[in-house]
Amino acid sequence: MTDLHSTVEKVTARVIERSRETRKAYLDLIQYEREKGVDRPNLSCSNLAHGFAAMNGDKPALRDFNRMNIGVVTSYNDMLSAHEPYYRYPEQMKVFAREVGATVQVAGGVPAMCDGVTQGQPGMEESLFSRDVIALATSVSLSHGMFEGAALLGICDKIVPGLLMGALRFGHLPTILVPSGPMTTGIPNKEKIRIRQLYAQGKIGQKELLDMEAACYHAEGTCTFYGTANTNQMVMEVLGLHMPGSAFVTPGTPLRQALTRAAVHRVAELGWKGDDYRPLGKIIDEKSIVNAIVGLLATGGSTNHTMHIPAIARAAGVIVNWNDFHDLSEVVPLIARIYPNGPRDINEFQNAGGMAYVIKELLSANLLNRDVTTIAKGGIEEYAKAPALNDAGELVWKPAGEPGDDTILRPVSNPFAKDGGLRLLEGNLGRAMYKASAVDPKFWTIEAPVRVFSDQDDVQKAFKAGELNKDVIVVVRFQGPRANGMPELHKLTPALGVLQDNGYKVALVTDGRMSGATGKVPVALHVSPEALGGGAIGKLRDGDIVRISVEEGKLEALVPADEWNARPHAEKPAFRPGTGRELFDIFRQNAAKAEDGAVAIYAGAGI
């Protein structure tokens, strides 16, 4: 057994110690559910008859309690490009299950929002809380007691974390994530940036912008940038919840179909009546969560996962915080550059070696815990292999080779950066996260006057009026989970990018979120405590000097201490109801802080 890197070992040990009581309570829960919870043998005849009434040819199998019944929770809709392929999955999966003597039922559906559609719109204020709704819907779906295993169909931003948060309440069930894959590549990313900035400057019209956007987002599958959706897939791969190499195979291909078939066959093998029982609650543990953070840092993944990973972990009784991310970032090298951290997209990453190469390199550097349980029989080492179809059309896995393009992937011995993509900033403004992997190091330290806003639309107005044509740190506050649901502010990126290109020192500080697609412009985000909770960001005034320094790990308002301490907090803007946002008031009231995952449904749930 090779030695684990000392920092990874140290962080893992403290996560285990910090989680000792909560993890024990969780394991006790899933053991109880396995032994005494509701399952088919414990249902009444009437319960069972209702459960398989519409199943036609599968009824005999469903009456046989020695056969595995897999509950599918699907996030299908055909507005969300990544989820459109799931239209075909349930019927295909039923066929695949019958091949191994099992059955499949659609246990339920969950909503799936597209942040690309709601970006900059009122619906974005429901986006983060949709994760909690998805968790609740997943729990409802699996509550019928008809299933010995689960298959979760989800890809995008809040959907995968929500599915896992709900499924972990049924952690005694073997569970697999079944992805659909990325869309084929559209226009070059540099061209996308150029046209968006031209539009922000008023140099082209809406038709030209829409033509570009439609050429970029043009088919079924995930968006091809390395944002939150594709970071989800990386995390699932490192957690061992996919069939190895499933993450980035495009939809509608023979390999994609073969991987879906293999996923159904594999979860059917994992029931507790067999000899390879692997429940979800044992796969997600302290060590696998640390591995997920390592994967995030090594690939420059989405900042949203500084909330999603803690939220998922907490559902399994595991407690992580931003210090864990920061300490791991100091020793985990950046070995992948995928847009927005570089010019190449997720398909080019896959063709260059993809997740198999990333995991191979991280294992070789002893940066991953090896003693973890995965869906794959051989453990985490199996994820250092890439899937392929042999000449007979059979699914096989081949060891990862060398990267096909060193502008996308590099070995640990020659990384893009010696440390990871995310940094913790601290100071008299609170704690915040910073995505260093997407920002030119010359912008890692910025000291400038602030311009304070409480609404992203007002930032756009100020930009168009020329009021931001100077060195400026734009502050957008009252964007935290308890204020308005913590929307993403990605709509501001083109305007801030124009200012940066014009030679100004510019940055953004916010208690809100930014899209996983955000890059280039320095952003201190998820500032905690948030403004509504009395956070110091609520004290800032126009003209205050703020210093952001990645090297120093600082986020400071350079205001004399006596004056700073005496300042009152700004008042929260009036809430504007509409588009259903008013229905989420109970979520806003109960949301945890960003560092704890900004989860509302855990309050009072003993989680």
UniProtKB/Swiss-Prot annotation:
Binds 1 [4Fe-4S] cluster. The keyword Iron applies. [4Fe-4S] cluster binds at residues 156, 223. The keyword Cell inner membrane does not apply. Keywords: 4Fe-4S, Carbohydrate metabolism, Gluconate utilization, Iron, Iron-sulfur, Lyase, Metal-binding. It holds the Pfam family ILV_EDD_C. Its EC number is 4.2.1.12. Gene3D superfamilies: IlvD/EDD C-terminal domain-like. One of its GO terms (molecular function) is phosphogluconate dehydratase activity. One of its GO terms (cellular component) is cytosol. Pathway: Carbohydrate metabolism; Entner-Doudoroff pathway. SUPFAM superfamilies: IlvD/EDD N-terminal domain-like, LeuD/IlvD-like. InterPro entries: 6-phosphgluc_deHydtase, Dihydro-acid_dehy_C, DiOHA_6PGluconate_deHydtase_CS, ILV_EDD_C, ILV_EDD_N, IlvD/EDD_N. One of its GO terms (biological process) is Entner-Doudoroff pathway through 6-phosphogluconate. Its cofactor is [4Fe-4S] cluster. It catalyses: 6-phospho-D-gluconate = 2-dehydro-3-deoxy-6-phospho-D-gluconate + H2O. Belongs to the IlvD/Edd family. Catalyzes the dehydration of 6-phospho-D-gluconate to 2-dehydro-3-deoxy-6-phospho-D-gluconate. This is Phosphogluconate dehydratase.
